[in-house]
Structure formats: structure tokens, C-alpha cells
């Protein structure tokens, strides 16, 4: 997401960027730790120009900085990482857990004839592959593709301090 400062007072308040994978957990974290402040933005997960005014942005920056300083954000990120690591793999929906796609698109792409040559792969030497699970039949849950880290939260807090309010575009 592209997040633009509405009335920046410093360079770091002009623009903040996260791809959708990083933005979603960051926005969720903000809403979790400061729900009343964040309520001023209804559409955190869309790029329709919604955002917070200058007062709310400064208030959110203060909350995030306090939680960064006392280690709360680091603990939240570590707890989230442990939770995600503990999630079981899911059966791949494209190959029904077989590790081989046989639908028309896959056959046209030659996936049903592809030999797996990667050493250490559980199906090494076998014919047939799935591009969704790398021919394994299972894959990590979709939620695990959304990273969250302390550095990203700190960068967003720095943006918030000098953005003069922001719009998510």
C-alpha cells in the first residue's frame, strides 16, 4: 500500500510503502493496540484514500513508540511468529494433496509430466508436479505469507510522527 502524508513536516512523513503482505499485519497490529485512535480510518485494508487526520496519526505514533520502547511490540511479533510456526501445513487445494496437478491448465503447462529432480524433495525422481505446493501435497497456511517485524512498525511510527495525517492509496 502507498501511504501518503497529508501535510508532512519532515521527509519521513511524506510517504510510507508496504506491499500488501507487510501492510495487512501492520494495519491489524495498529488496530489491535490502539482501536479508538484507529477507528478514524474505516478502510485500513483498501487503497481508497482513507486514513487518519494529523491528531490521530500523532496519537498512534505515540502509542507505537511507547510499545516499541517497552518491548511490547517485540513480544507481540514473537508471539505471532510462534503461533504461525505452530500452525499445521494444509492440504493443497490445487492437487488435492497428491502433489501432482492434472487439471487442464496444468496438463497444458506440462506439470503432469515434469520430473522432480530436487534432492531431498519427498517425491524426488517422481513424475508430476504442482506449482502451488511444489509437488509436496501440503503447504504452509496462507496467513504465514504475511510477515510482521519490529523494524516495519518503527518505520511506520516515524512516518506517523511527521505525516500530518495520511491517506492510504
List PLM regions with ranges.
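Acidic (Asp/Glu-rich) sequence patches and key acidic residues
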Residues: 1-169
Amino acid at each position: 500500500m502507498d501511504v501518503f502524508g497529508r501535510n508532512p513536516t519532515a521527509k519521513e512523513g511524506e510517504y510510507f510503502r508496504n506491499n500488501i503482505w507487510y501492510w495487512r499485519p501492520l494495519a491489524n497490529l495498529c488496530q489491535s493496540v490502539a482501536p479508538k485512535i484507529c477507528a478514524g480510518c474505516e478502510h485500513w485494508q483498501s487503497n481508497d484514500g482513507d486514513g487518519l487526520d494529523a491528531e490521530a496519526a500523532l496519537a498512534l505514533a505515540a502509542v507505537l513508540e511507547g510499545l516499541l520502547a517497552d518491548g511490547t511490540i517485540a513480544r507481540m511479533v514473537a508471539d505471532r511468529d510462534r503461533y504461525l510456526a505452530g500452525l499445521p501445513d494444509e492440504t493443497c487445494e490445487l492437487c488435492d494433496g497428491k502433489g501432482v496437478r492434472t487439471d487442464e491448465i496444468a496438463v497444458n503447462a506440462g506439470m503432469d509430466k515434469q520430473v522432480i529432480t530436487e534432492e531431498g524433495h519427498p517425491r524426488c525422481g517422481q513424475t508430476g508436479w504442482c506449482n502451488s505446493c511444489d509437488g509436496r501435497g501440503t503447504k504452509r497456511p496462507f496467513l504465514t505469507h504475511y510477515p510482521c517485524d519490529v523494524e516495519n512498525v518503527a518505520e511506520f511510527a516515524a512516518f506517523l510522527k511527521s505525516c500530518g495525517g495520511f491517506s492510504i492509496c
